[in-house]
Amino acid sequence: MKMEEAVGKVEELIESEAPPKASEQETAKEEDGSVELESQVQKDGVADSTVISSMPCLLMELRRDSSESQLASTESDKPTTGRVYESDSSNHCMLSPSSSGHLADSDTLSSAEENEPSQAETAVEGDPSGVSGATVGRKSRRSRSESETSTMAAKKNRQSSDKQNGRVAKVKGHRSQKHKERIRLLRQKREAAARKKYNLLQDSSTSDSDLTCDSSTSSSDDDEEVSGSSKTITAEIPETGFCYVVQAGLGLLGLSDLHTLASQSAEILWDSHLA
């Protein structure tokens, strides 16, 4: 009986020691998997290995994820032993700015972020037409704005120079009633003066012969001095039937005076016609 009890106790001890051995085997497998993962990561490339080695917390998380995936795939039918991980508050790697959850705050750049400038440069080199079109559009807008500003500045300078020179710009608009009336009166005065001078020219040309005859008959009266006095000469014109009075200061009108009178009357008539 004592032997049987001793054998039972030994078997119980063996059974109690068997699960720790299984757990030790599982931890050994996990370590082997992590070593294999590290070797694969080192074989990927020098750039990736340098980035991962610079971030030990990321390496630890990758190891943990790979070990969990391997255990889930190989030992899905076996109950996995629970593994205790440190909390986020106690894990200094998770609190550090270089952790995977805070890559945006870290000073180091990942491979994707490093590749972004190179991709932008390749895009610019690959499509120069789009870049040239954008630059041409910007240049055209800039040239248009510069031309508008230059025209505005030239207009302002012209207005300021006109004000300094005393010139007032003509205001185009409807004429007032007073202005129209004044223009009409001036036109009437010019027409009346032109009509008088024209009549004087016609009468002087027709009565020139009569005046010469009267002057020859009145030669007896020429003994008197006429330098300081004026002499009135009347001549009857048969065509018109009225007398024309010529007021002569020093003498009769000559041909040169008639020519100047005709030219002046012609100019006045032309001005009245234009008005």
Curated annotation (Swiss-Prot):
Comp. bias intervals (Low complexity): 203-219
GO CC annotation: nucleus
Subcellular location: Nucleus
Compositional bias ranges of the Basic residues kind: 169-187
Basic and acidic residues bias (residue ranges): 1-12, 23-32
Region (Required for interaction with CSNK2B): 202-226
Coiled-coil region: 175-200
Annotated positions of the Phosphoserine modification: S66, S67, S143, S145, S147
Pfam families listed in its UniProt record: RNF111_N (PF15303)
Keyword Heme (UniProt): no
Keyword terms of this UniProt record: Coiled coil, Nucleus, Phosphoprotein
Skewed-composition ranges (Polar residues): 87-121
Region Disordered: start-end pairs: 1-50, 63-233
Disulfide bonds: none
Subunit structure: Interacts with CSNK2B (via KSSR). Interacts with JUN; the interaction is mediated by CSNK2B.
The protein's name in its UniProt record: Protein ARK2N
Species classification: Eukaryota, Metazoa, Chordata, Craniata, Vertebrata
